[in-house]
Design a protein with these regions (language model features):
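P-loop NTPase switch/communication element
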Residues: 1-4
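Acidic, Mg2+-coordinating active-site environments of NTP-dependent enzymes
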Residues: 8-19, 25-29, 34-188, 263-273, ...
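Active-site beta-alpha loop architecture of Rossmann-like, nucleotide-cofactor-dependent enzymes
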Residues: 22-23, 303
Length: 419
């Protein structure tokens, strides 16, 4: 309350704040005059504080059922399972209900298309259509954005001003944030996801946007909800390609015991590594990254410390990723060749969304998911072996001319295959 009073004296007349379930239950937000309240989503969290999910939801709903005054507004998604409760609260307390969704909503989503590192969104509001490029990844980001638009409009901002400003939006620090693209075009994201639902949303979002199962580095915090640990393992097993279990603020718990509880959630132990030291786990994930792959480092996001009992160590996932010297990492010969080749071929392939795991000029030993480059030498012309390369499961062939009786969709033409 003191901070809000200070802000008001500075002439600021609109404030957006997070109403935590702890603060609501402890009546720390009582007395504040909320004009708009947003309900984004509800999932398992804070069960070290609340008795169960029912009590947790009850605490969150205090904002809507007690603190909002008559004729003020609730903003939410009309597709979430908590919507009927919010609708009933709005009716009983005579509140205005503003919604986002694909039908029967204040803002109606018409279409959404994934692009490289952004989304093309079309929506309708007050009988007017808007089409915008949103520089964020994930449908959850779109939902949050649309709810923010309604809240901003309710704060007195003009809708056209709001829409024009969207192109300037940047990811929230540590929230599904692209930190680095490696020479092999693998992308590294960090995210604060530390609950089963948040982790599932992030992994699923990356999988849907880039059409590939991400690799994931994650752990679970000590002295927090223990029930979620094996559940998070199950989520990773469902959506991730490679899984690296590491430490994430063990606090006064045994890090080894936390890792064991995580491991208990896996049905299979395939493609899973336990690497306690977080920086080493991140480095290992980068070393093992595939060309055009995705790595998600989850759990800490924006945080800059790692807590082991009474020790608080400086540790930032973002800093670790940025400071890794790719040239000094000891890649396997296979991976290093892929990095060099994909760095050269990136400009050629980026427009076609081509996925591959290696490059070869030998049609006889080419492997599945490789690209074959048809090079003309003194004695042989690689174009004569394109058919053989495709028969041996090459994904695509790079050529400088069309080949008879070969599907053109399997050919990537360039002027000179050697260059």
């Amino acid at each position: 309350h003191r901070e809000l009073s200070r802000i008001k004296k500075l002439g600021i007349n609109n404030v957006i704040l997070e109403a935590s379930s702890h603060g609501l239950l402890q009546a720390r937000l009582n007395g504040l005059d909320f004009k708009t309240a947003i309900f984004t989503n509800f999932s398992q969290d804070h069960l070290d504080y609340h008795k169960n999910m029912k009590d947790y939801l009850k605490a969150k709903l205090i904002l809507f059922s007690k603190l909002l005054k008559e004729k003020n507004k609730i903003v939410t998604d009309n597709k979430i399972k908590e919507f009927p409760k919010l609708k009933l609260i709005a009716k009983n307390r005579k509140l205005n209900l503003l919604t986002i969704g694909t039908e029967n909503s204040t803002i109606k989503i018409n279409s959404l298309t994934n692009k490289n590192n952004f989304q093309q969104l079309s929506f309708r509001h007050n009988n007017k259509k808007y089409t915008i490029a949103v520089p964020l990844i994930g449908f959850f980001q779109i939902k949050n954005l649309l709810m923010a638009i309604l809240a901003a409009e309710n704060s007195g901002l003009n809708i056209n001003t709001i829409v024009k400003s969207i192109k300037k939006i940047k990811e929230v620090n540590g929230r599904l944030q692209l930190i680095r693209t490696l020479p092999n075009q693998a992308k590294i994201f960090i995210d604060y996801a530390h609950t089963p639902n948040a982790l599932e949303v992030s992994l699923k979002t990356l999988k849907e946007h880039y059409n590939i199962n991400p690799d994931v580095v994650f752990g679970c915090g000590g002295e927090r909800d223990k029930k979620k640990r094996p559940i998070m393992a199950k989520v990773c097993e469902k959506y991730a390609e490679k899984i690296y279990i590491t430490d994430d603020n063990p606090r006064n718990e045994s890090p080894q015991l936390i890792r064991q509880m995580i491991m208990s959630g896996f049905k299979k132990r395939k493609n899973i590594q336990i690497i306690p030291l977080r920086s080493k786990a991140i480095t290992t994930a980068i070393i093992n990254s595939k060309p055009n792959g995705i790595i998600l480092i989850a759990g800490k996001g924006h945080e800059t410390v790692q807590i082991y009992k009474n020790k608080i160590l400086n540790s930032s996932d973002k800093t670790i990723v940025k400071k890794i010297n790719i040239n000094k990492i000891k890649y396997s010969k296979k991976n290093y060749n892929q990095i060099l080749n994909t760095e050269i071929l990136y400009k050629l392939t980026k427009k076609n969304n081509i996925k591959f795991e290696g490059v070869s000029i030998d049609s006889k030993i080419i492997q599945k998911k490789n690209i074959f480059i048809a090079i003309k030498g003194k004695n042989h012309d690689g174009h004569s072996f394109v058919k053989e390369a495709l028969k041996n499961k090459a994904n695509f062939c790079i050529v400088n001319r069309n080949i008879k009786n070969i599907n053109r969709n399997k050919l990537i033409k360039c002027r000179n295959t050697i260059n």
